Amino acid sequence: MKIALIGNQNSGKTSLFNLLTGNNQKVGNWPGVTLERKTGILRTSNAEVIDLPGIYSLSPYSHEENIVRRFLLEEKVDLIINIIDSTAIERSLYLTTQLFNFNIPMVIALNMTDLAFEQGIRIDVNKLSKALSVPVVPISCLKRTGIKDLIMLITKDTPTSTNYLTIYSNPLQETINKTAELLPIDAKEFLAIKLLENDIDLAPRIDLDVSKDIKKLNDHYKLGVSEVLANERYNFIEKVRDIAVSSRE
C-alpha cells in the first residue's frame, strides 16, 4: 500500500511522518529540484508512506505544488493522509476540497487539537467527519496522542470510499462531470477542473477543446472559472465550519 502524506506547511506533517515511520526512512531528492523526498515504512505494516512537500493549494505556482500534483497524477496512491492544523481549520480545508477531486481514499489527521482547545476552539470530530464524508482522527504530534488510533485505522480498517460530497453548483458541476467523462485517464475530475480553469501546466497537455464550455460558464456566473471554483470551495468550508466548529464563550 502506498500512502501520500499531504498538508499545509507548518501543519506538523513531517512530525507526523516521523511518528508513523520511526527510523524506517529513506531520504532523496524529487526529480529536477533540490527538495527532499522522504519515504518510510509505516510502523507495524509494510505500507510505504511518502512525505510530500507542504502546500496550501494545488495550483501550479511553485515547485512544491507541482511535485504534489505530479505525484498524485503519476503514482498509484492507495490512501491520502491529509493532516490539518486544528487552529487554522478553514485554511487547511481548502486543500482538502481539492484533494477530493482525485477520487483517492482519504483520512484526515486533525493535528494540534490540544492547542485549538487552549485557544477556545471546539471541533466536533464526528460532525466534521460526517460533513466531509471522510474519517477524521484527532491527534497531537507534540504530545504523541492519537497516533496509535491513526495507525490502527490505516492498517485494520483502511478507508476505501471515495464517495465525496458534491460541493459545486450547477451548471459548473454538470460541466465538470461531462468533461471528465471524455477523459480516458485517471484523476478525471481533477483534470476536468484544470481544463476548465485553463491551467497553464496541464491544459496544453490534454487534447480536448473546452473553450465553448468555459465561455458558457463565464457567461452564467459572470466570473472566471477559477474564481467560481474558489468561491464555492470557501462556501462549502464555511458550512462545514458552522456544523463542526464552535468557540468557547
Where are these regions (language model features)?
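Alpha-helical transmembrane helix bundles of large polytopic membrane transport and channel proteins
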Residues: 107, 117-248
